[in-house]
């Protein structure tokens, strides 16, 4: 299958009325905000999107995105590869009142003054939200052993004298 670049912006209502489906990619160069959140973006962002009108006559965008990124393990500090897969379901709105009236199944997405949505920013947002809060290797792949991880009371050799103890004695005088 040929890799097709997706549009950056589009009119979601017109697209939903035509019931269009998109399958394509965003290149690593295009997803700058994702690149700022990870060590590196290792693959194209592969997206599939479907636009439709639901039973309540709302325009709906459903889809998913998959990308492979490198993250820094927070235990050992080494980079590791992680595949991010996210799904989404949006409905375009023009105001907060419309957003409040949406069914819970739909996330609101604001349209600009031309009635278009920023598709790239939407996909980037979903990928960033799907990234792990604390990225770590699986325990068997991490170079930090279970013995090196200390929980609760610190061993005696790890407890150092408080450097501010001198200040406490001066305060008493």
UniProtKB/Swiss-Prot annotation:
Keyword line: Ribosome biogenesis
Protein induction: Part of the yceD-rpmF operon, which may continue into downstream genes.
Protein name: Large ribosomal RNA subunit accumulation protein YceD
Family according to the record: Belongs to the DUF177 domain family.
Transmembrane segments: none
Function as written in the Swiss-Prot or TrEMBL entry: Plays a role in synthesis, processing and/or stability of 23S rRNA.
Keyword GTP-binding in annotation: no
Keyword Thylakoid belongs to the record: no
NCBIfam families on file: PRK11193.1
Any one GO BP annotation for this protein: ribosome biogenesis
Gene (name only): yceD
Domain of life: Bacteria
Pfam families (UniProt xref): YceD (PF02620)
Organism per entry: Salmonella typhimurium (strain LT2 / SGSC1412 / ATCC 700720)
GO cellular component entries: cytosol
